[in-house]
């Protein structure tokens, strides 16, 4: 194994450790909260921006409205996440929650590594290095990356269909 393999293992292990500490429920709610924040900010900023009459530039008003909605949604999500996390601890499900959290964290780590490997391969010369070709773990991620791009090509209007 080369240093790239150890870095891959470290990313997956760190993601798993974070999820072990936080638990599945908190990790999943955090992910949902971020998705909701993007949704709320992108769909409702026009309703809030009309209240920022102190700013003449529409771009500034919209930017402030997006930021306010995004941050407010994250705050509300954090409060909900905290309350539900406390509920999970009080019900005695924290052991199961943490085991599921490790699984969630490992999956997230694998997806993060796949994304990093894709960008390193596509936009840098790292993929031409000797360590890249000697890596035992990098070939294992080609399946994930290939499946993702096959899905994108079949579902995206931006990419030509095969």
Swiss-Prot record:
- The highest taxon in the source lineage is Bacteria
Q: Where in the cell is it found?
A: Cell inner membrane
How does the entry describe its membrane topology?
A: Multi-pass membrane protein
- One cellular component term from this protein's GO annotations in UniProt: plasma membrane
Membrane-spanning intervals of the chain? 1-21, 32-52, 64-84, 99-119
Q: What does this protein do?
A: Required for colicin V production from plasmid IncFI ColV3-K30.
List the protein's name.
Colicin V production protein
- Name the gene that codes for it: cvpA
